[in-house]
Curated annotation (Swiss-Prot):
Terpene cyclase that catalyzes the cyclization of farnesyl diphosphate (FPP) to various sesquiterpenes, including alpha-muurolene, gamma-muurolene, germacrene, delta-cadinene, delta-cadinol and cubenol. It comes from the Eukaryota. It is an enzyme of class 4 (lyase). The record marks F96 as: Plays a critical role in the stabilization of intermediate cation. It catalyses: (2E,6E)-farnesyl diphosphate = alpha-muurolene + diphosphate; (2E,6E)-farnesyl diphosphate = gamma-muurolene + diphosphate; (2E,6E)-farnesyl diphosphate = delta-cadinene + diphosphate. Belongs to the terpene synthase family. The DDXXD motif is important for the catalytic activity, presumably through binding to Mg(2+). Mg(2+) 1 binds at D99. This is Sesquiterpene synthase Agr3. The gene is Agr3. It comes from Cyclocybe aegerita. GO terms for molecular function: metal ion binding; terpene synthase activity. GO terms for biological process: isoprenoid biosynthetic process. Pfam families: Terpene_syn_C_2 (PF19086). Its cofactor is Mg(2+).
Amino acid sequence: MNASPFLNESSPTRPTSFVLPDLVSHCKFPLSYHPNGDEIAQESVDWLDSSCPDLTAKQRRALRVLQSGELTAYCYNQATSPERLRVVSDFLTYLFHLDNISDGMMTRETDVLADVVMNAFWFTDKYMPTRGPGKEQLDEELNPGKLARDFWSRAIADCGVGVQARFKETMGLFFEAVNIQARMRDEDTIPDLESYIDVRRDTSGCKPSWVLIEYALGIDLPDHVVDHPIMQALNQGTNDLVTWSNDIFSYNVEQSRGDTHNMIVILMEYHGHTLQSAVDYVGELCAQTIDTFCENKERLPSWGPEIDDMVARYVKGLQDWIVGSLHWSFQTQRYFGKDGLDIKKHRFVKLLPLEAAK
């Protein structure tokens, strides 16, 4: 692997800063927050904290300043009950937890993680360890499975069968992509841009998160509506915006620990970009994606009053994810530490030294 995106600390050509694109100003969608958001956010933090005895003190501090529950309150502000909001908040908190524990895993370890979690989704009533060759599971369920079983059992108590099927399908895609990412990490390779985009659309966890928009609203869209090309374009556009903007916001922390699963790195590695020109390029892609999303909203067909109402609320949920994630990225300490609100104003990011995040 060419190490050019992570030049030696003493190299005179290593950049020291970059300027963020002003995506917040480009996005004109209204920002809303669920009235039960703060209460539910605290409950989700307490849930994961108390359910994970192996977390280090550093990991517990990071959980407290992550504010995944606040992200939920922005992005699922239409949730019809505190109980539904809580399930989604627990899932997003859990999803960040999965991201943290899968970072650095070898391919075989991600296989084990996937089997444990998917077991909970498919056999929710009771832990049923698999015994197939190469897929043997321990008699005692691992903690990621217990957590998944806990929030999923609450979800399916009042969840449409279509939503359940789509959630399990998209979580399967998530783990397949995490496995591919682990394989690239094992082989110390950086993928080409097209391959990266395909994998990143699944490692982001956006697809199951979009399914939970339906759950939060208490709806179950018909398959022919979900599969319509315009609906698919709206889903993918939202995924791309959230994912690509996250590559910009998370780049500083990731470069400090040598993480290459980022579009900025690929543009620098294979397409001759400087750090700033790569950031600008991805920022322009994000702006175009917001514009295309607005155009696709106007192209939605009609399926009759009842379905049209469900579709309108669902698309509003995608829109809430776009604007909510942009604002939340400066509120959480995951990307910019305690400087997020200041960086949101001046958009100037000073690069962390290498290995600082470890």
